Amino acid sequence: GDPKVLVTSLRGTLTEGVDYRGDRLAAAAVCGVPIIDTSSPRTRAVKTAYDRRFGADGRGGRSGFETALTVPAVRKARQAIGRVIRGPDEVGVRAFVDARYARESWDSVRGYLPPAEREEFRPVSPDMLGYGIEQFWSSVGTDR
């Protein structure tokens, strides 16, 4: 049928529990880093527990914020873009639409991606995104 766009939250089953095999899903874009509400009492309690266990400055490896919020957020984002390519013969576009995935800085999440993914992803400026996607589909011999 005609091309379609699905917009959903990263907290729903469409980004984790549905298998889009074959050409059912050609691309996925995660806009932002899906960190949950940091002000909720539960979130603050979990963060505090991790801070007490590992040290607020990450002495034990990671801070409470990283362990309670950042790591699960990056895991959710990776799970969502993983919906695109489910087998060795599938191709698709996977995009993280947030500079924090690409650059090294105090608020970067790049270090939470596996090394192979860090190498695979290519930062693209917004004005070149359309061109980059067209070039990708041309290179794999598919018109999407």
Map each language-model feature to its residues.
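ASCE RecA-like P-loop NTPase motor cores
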Residues: 1-144
